[in-house]
Regions:
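C-terminal motif of bacterial Sec signal peptides marking the signal peptidase cleavage site
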Residues: 17-19
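Short, conserved beta-strand segments of beta-strand-rich sandwich/propeller modules, principally
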Residues: 49, 91-95, 155-157
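Recognizes extended acidic, P/S/T-rich segments that occur
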Residues: 54, 61-91, 97, 101-108, ...
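Aromatic-lined ligand-binding clefts that engage carbohydrates, nucleic acids, or primary amines
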Residues: 147-150, 154-172
Length: 200
């Protein structure tokens, strides 16, 4: 009986340790966001904020450490540091790995993306377009330009700035779901812009 009890206690202890480790391995970072947005495009910050949640069977999971890895290719991610320089008009891939309160590594998240836009005025190559009317002229101006692309486009972005509101159409289809973009501001001090993915 003594040998059986000893064997039973050892088996339970071993099972308990393995179960705890297995439980932590099931904890995975989910709902990855950049600047509180999912898969955003048009971020104009060189130091974006990364956030995520935890999904797993452990109710009171507490992470002791996390590591964000980032890169321009999902197959070549490097540890993210505060002094890392992000480039404008670039898609970045990132994921996060966490360690539990005991220092054991947990699952790595799936890879998320974000895309930078313009960081400074010199990143702009477009020029302002306007009608010749005074600002008191009430009818809203409409601008139209026809052009033909000489090659296939892999990806396309449109950056629209307006001293007021705009609606953008390409091939007769309205671009974007929002109205009253790019939003009100003091137009004598700053002009906002919106980024659209118009690849399709």
């Amino acid at each position: 009986m003594v040998k059986k009890n000893t064997l039973l206690i050892c088996s339970l202890a071993f099972f308990s340790l393995m179960g705890c480790k297995g439980k932590n391995e099931l904890t995975v970072p989910v709902n990855l966001r950049t600047e509180y947005l999912r898969e955003p495009i048009g971020l104009d910050t060189k130091s974006p904020r990364f956030t995520w949640e935890y999904k797993g069977s452990e109710k009171n999971f507490l992470a002791s450490r996390s590591e964000i890895r980032i890169g321009t290719s999902p197959d070549n991610l490097q540890p993210y540091t505060d002094n890392m320089t992000l480039e404008p008009h670039t898609r970045y891939y990132w994921n996060v790995t966490v360690w539990d309160q005991d220092g054991d590594i947990c699952e790595t998240s799936e890879t998320a993306t974000f895309e930078t836009a313009k960081f400074k005025s010199s990143d702009w190559s477009g020029k302002w377009i306007t009608d010749s009317h005074d600002k008191e002229f009430e009818p809203a101006p409409m601008f139209r330009k026809a052009f033909t692309l000489g090659k296939e486009i892999e990806e396309a972005r449109v950056y629209v700035a307006a001293a007021g509101y705009y609606d953008l159409f390409i091939n007769g289809k309205r671009v974007g779901e929002n109205y009253l973009d790019p939003g009100y501001t003091h137009f004598d001090k700053r002009i906002l812009y919106v980024t659209h993915d118009v690849t399709s």
